Design a protein with these regions (language model features):
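Acidic catalytic patch
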Residues: 40, 64-68, 90-121
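Acidic, PIN/NYN-like endoribonuclease modules and their adjacent C-terminal/linker elements
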Residues: 1-22, 108-122, 130-166
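Short, well-structured N-terminal submotif of metal-dependent ribonuclease cores
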Residues: 1-62, 74-90, 157-158
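A generic structural signal for short hydrophobic patches within well-formed alpha-helices
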Residues: 34, 67-70, 150-151
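Short, amphipathic alpha-helical segments that act as regulatory/interfacial helices
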Residues: 71-75, 137
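Conserved beta-strand segments of alpha/beta enzyme cores
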Residues: 59, 100-102, 161-162
Length: 166
């Protein structure tokens, strides 16, 4: 049984060269990975669960955007395995109460030119992906996603180690 504890919050910090040289361990999970983990009938559930099992030592993270999107998507009537909103929120809350989880505050702005080159955004569909990758990079986290078309050139601080495509 997972250990229960108060939610851990990742504290944003200034990049340090020594810290940046090492591969970040904790991973901010994209909403598509969260959904695959929570929905045992999801086509990518086994792949997401295997990846998390192999990487749980570093821990995992979520943020308000990924949590809200997970609840919204999994509870909408068009979702194949839709559940009531309260049930999805309960399952996600249980997952985030484990010792391996940390909450990442969304304290990085897409408008901050220090973090993002918005001239590289090719369209509206890249905005959230670029933001989440930038949030991960700003907090020295990996960003785990199923999305192979990640707009990494938008994020100024990113390196290949920050992006994990499952």
């Amino acid at each position: 049984m997972p250990s229960r504890r108060a939610p851990k919050v990742v504290q944003a910090r200034e990049p340090r060269a020594a810290c940046r040289a090492a591969r970040p361990k904790r991973a901010l999970l994209d909403v598509n990975v969260l959904i695959a983990l929570l929905d045992t009938d999801h086509i990518h559930h086994a792949r997401a669960a295997a990846w998390l099992s192999d990487n749980i030592g570093g821990g995992w993270a979520s943020c308000a955007i990924t949590q809200n999107a997970c609840v919204r998507i999994m509870s909408q009537p068009g979702y194949p395995n839709a559940l009531p909103t309260a049930r999805v929120a309960e399952r996600l809350r249980e997952a985030t109460e484990t010792a391996a989880h940390a909450f990442v505050p969304g304290d990085v702005s897409l408008l901050a030119s220090r973090h993002f080159d918005t001239e590289q955004l090719l369209g509206h569909r890249q905005v959230t992906d670029a933001y989440l990758l930038g949030l991960a990079a700003a907090n020295d986290l990996r960003f785990a996603t199923f999305d192979g078309a990640m707009p990494s050139r938008v994020v100024r601080e990113t390196r290949p180690a920050y992006l994990v495509v499952l």
